[in-house]
């Protein structure tokens, strides 16, 4: 499996994961031997820690917490421990400030996740959680689906960060953080970039295999664990307890490297992958005819914006009421009657109002409405404005959600909003976004406009979500929000050209 780049992300938070090539699974001793090629020749017995102790504890705790809560449940998920050699190998690579997986000779025996950001502080745990959040795009392959290869089903740009984190037999981790004065990230030079590298052993992401076995937790642990289980993870007490670290003594010994013979495995046969289906474009605006009734077309959530054709003024379609129109009325002729459209057609927004006791006739703008003295569902019409925005405007600023519904203008976005930094133009979520997100940068993330040309979009404010999951799409990395305190959400849609 090769490493995949999800597109250019010039600013903000980025993530990658290394795919597995599936050649061998040597032990940590080989890892040490390979690592020695990247260490300085000077003889010294002690080296500085590559990551603060509190960050190390956060990374390890979060990995084990996430591994223990996978769904469907895992029967053979092993408890993960920290490995100093993996930490040193991660530090050696992070110090190179090269935005790619490496070194090449080490990747045959370890898994690797990379993250980078600049600007405001991000803890290592933020990166780890964002890697795990790819679970939303991953579908677990059950044994009945593996014949003999398990299908690879990832509906997002990448799921291999997640699968490496929850690979059952990966039980060692070591990470490092390095601040790079300058680092080239997909063609863009970042200054003071924070580079986060995590190395894993044994490596995961083997092609055609599920990341873990499904079943009752700890029911299929390796015999070496002796039947012990902790928080749904196969667990054994470590015989070696490291000495407590202090700020003055935050160092580790460099152990000698013993000689050892290694058994090499034959390369695995890789199945050809099928091209992924492209998702259909969603539109909020529905194209209707002069005789389209509101009750016939208004179904579902995208029931508030319609494109009316020209020539409806003299059409025979009926409308009932004044101000409040009965649901069997023509949408377009009601808009002309109210005065927001003329015979040239155009956009109209609908607001549903529930039942009213009766509807009174009137003649307005050349259209005669009828009376109906019978309780029925009703709706109102309103004019759609078109508004030019910059790359920073949010739905919270423009048209926040209010019950029963809020109508936003049709928005014209400028080009190149993807290039704006996340602290000025953040994006939170996937598919449904927090209303503190940049509207136009969100439109690029959602794929409804091109970054190079910009364009028109429709937005629909909705009530808030409990969580927002970040993802990398169309070169934009959106962020996750676990417990948003305030604010609502919105959906974003393409506009028919």
Swiss-Prot record:
Domain LCCL: 284-379, 385-488
Signal sequence extent: 1-22
Residues carrying a glycan: 27
Source domain of life: Eukaryota
Functional description taken from the UniProt entry: Promotes matrix assembly.
Pfam families given in the database record: CAP, LCCL
Primary location: secreted
Gene Ontology cellular component annotations, sorted alphabetically: extracellular exosome; extracellular matrix; extracellular region; extracellular space; ficolin-1-rich granule lumen; secretory granule lumen; transport vesicle
Localization of this protein: Secreted
Positions of disulphide bridges: 290-308, 312-332, 391-413, 417-440
Gene Ontology process terms (BP): extracellular matrix organization; face morphogenesis; lung development
Subunit composition and interactions: Binds to heparin, dermatan sulfate and chondroitin sulfate.
Keyword tags: Disulfide bond, Glycoprotein, Repeat, Secreted, Signal
Cross-referenced InterPro entries: Allrgn_V5/Tpx1_CS (IPR018244), CAP_dom (IPR014044), CAP_sf (IPR035940), CRISP-LCCL_domain (IPR051957), CRISP-related (IPR001283), LCCL (IPR004043), LCCL_sf (IPR036609)
Gene Ontology MF annotations: glycosaminoglycan binding; heparin binding
Listed Gene3D superfamilies: CAP, LCCL-like domain
UniProt record similarity statement: Belongs to the CRISP family.
Coiled coil: none
Record's protein name: Cysteine-rich secretory protein LCCL domain-containing 2
Domain SCP as annotated: residue spans: 62-200
